[in-house]
């Protein structure tokens, strides 16, 4: 199976439990890693986290370090819940492929078949002579479901030359759980706004997977959360994965910190919100504070909360070709399709040695990518850095994430460099 990588974040880096002996795993390197991560916490480079390392489906290391809530002196533990942001996209992409396997859709279908509002897409093209700084062009072809899965639909996160139009429509940022509006209604309104590029011409990271989540709801007649619970989370025994954390579990939700020039800062804060009006990554108050409940607007691109152990089960299912513990979620050929590169040579992709599958970044050339493993990816989304490294040949993977900047990037590099097979 080709290597897959997931965009997104989730503060999983190493936290409080067991390093287990496993053939082909260098325990001395794991010890170095544990000491390094403890030092990162002491130095104020990380507040805390959880690292889960698995090989051949067996847990090699599952340990917590640092703080779940530094100011309240609550230590991180392996059962801490983490906001996984864009790693939610992998769940939603799998849901779409489940629906294709069941005949509910084809990924070649135009989006307008299900949401007619997307039949008249306009694209904003920079034009200094235009009053708004851009002109509108009719999209050269319809957006397909495949375009959404590969982020080649031309839909971004409401930024660029038409950013003011998106802000005026109150569609901005990457998390909508606090909204009274359903995602299906929001997706219909998105169709009326200027898009960032013509379909099939560019890789544009954006609301694509949120739209796919709304499509899952439209076709299944369920909320995205209910569909994923029934079809994915429950069968895989992912008991600690939610869109809306039950009140009795909210004490397990880890605090989010941002790396600033003054060090780690608890999020959100009034000064950051004031100093960065309309900032894309800050001001996500409901998400960052964990005030999760009430409205039921399910963000298929960034809305889930999970644990390292739960997400490891999801990854293991994919590594095994769609099956885990005798439960088949996807067909083997479907997983192969998802992890193949679907970007044509005409679509520029800024990550050397990589392509993009149906929901995942795919490593194509280890040399060009310059990674130590069969696959590894560190992706930056402003202040969010996430690395998912999978040693496919050796069936080993680690998942790490942090809220930070280039300084934090060195931490995940260190992890990728130390955890490797003999």
Sequence positions of predicted segments:
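N-terminal signal peptide c-region/cleavage motif recognized by signal peptidases
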Residues: 16-17
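Active-site SXXK
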Residues: 31, 37-38, 57, 81-111, ...
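Short loop/turn motifs at secondary-structure junctions and domain boundaries
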Residues: 41-45, 74, 379-381, 388-391
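Short loop/turn microsegments at loop-to-beta-strand junctions
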Residues: 47-49, 60, 82, 376, ...
